[in-house]
UniProtKB/Swiss-Prot annotation:
Binding site for substrate: R71, G72, G73, Q74, V75, T76, Y77, H78, S138, L139, G140, G151, L152, A153
Protein name: Octanoyltransferase
Species: Shewanella baltica (strain OS223)
Keywords annotated in UniProt: Acyltransferase, Cytoplasm, Transferase
Domain BPL/LPL catalytic: from-to ranges: 32-207
Lowers pKa of active site Cys, annotated site positions: K135
GO molecular function: lipoyl(octanoyl) transferase activity
InterPro entries, A to Z: aa-tRNA-synth_II/BPL/LPL, BPL_LPL_catalytic, Octanoyltransferase, Octanoyltransferase_CS
Similarity comment text for this entry: Belongs to the LipB family.
Function: Catalyzes the transfer of endogenously produced octanoic acid from octanoyl-acyl-carrier-protein onto the lipoyl domains of lipoate-dependent enzymes. Lipoyl-ACP can also act as a substrate although octanoyl-ACP is likely to be the physiological substrate.
PANTHER family from the UniProt entry: LIPOYLTRANSFERASE 2, MITOCHONDRIAL-RELATED, OCTANOYLTRANSFERASE
Primary enzyme class: transferase
Amino acid sequence: MQDTTLHIRHLGKQDYESVWHAMQHYTDTRDSESHDELWIVEHPPVFTQGQAGKSEHILNAGDIPVIQVDRGGQVTYHGPGQLVVYPLLDIKRSKVGVRQLVTHIEQSIVDMLAKYDINAYAKADAPGVYVDERKIASLGLRIRKGCSFHGLALNVDMDLAPFRRINPCGYAGLEMAQCKALGGPQTVIEAGEQLTITFSQLLGYQHLVHHQGLAAS
């Protein structure tokens, strides 16, 4: 039976590795009674290389660290002004398939941007969300013990130049877009608030409980 309560954790600005390890710990130690959670965070500049990643897609990392991680997908960039959302969900309990979860995540971004009259869309052959063939949101998940972690990154109001140091998600020359320039959410906080609404509605959560920071381990 699905847990109809979703716990939202507002983490503020946090370094990537500490949040990644906290996600792993939560997933490894959760049981059938554990809450479904949505972690909302903003990271300092970092490139993360997924399990399918190839080193040749990192063109010139320069002074930005590269971290090899355990999510699906290839290389992407996180930095200030980007909304990062990690859904820590028991999809086995809620009977949601992995492909269905990916579709729900993409659609929640599309629905949120539609409120701002931005015509965004997903692609069957390239996970993420796009506007006029430019990528505005990236997606990479990991499923362990029937539970999801890692998640999505939505460009809101950021310096997009570091994306030119990589082939984003393995695609050479892929152009990026961001919300503020398109008349969408102007801040990471606004984007997080709006995306939480569309995501929880699509996944069938009826109650939202908000927390500041991570739970004490």
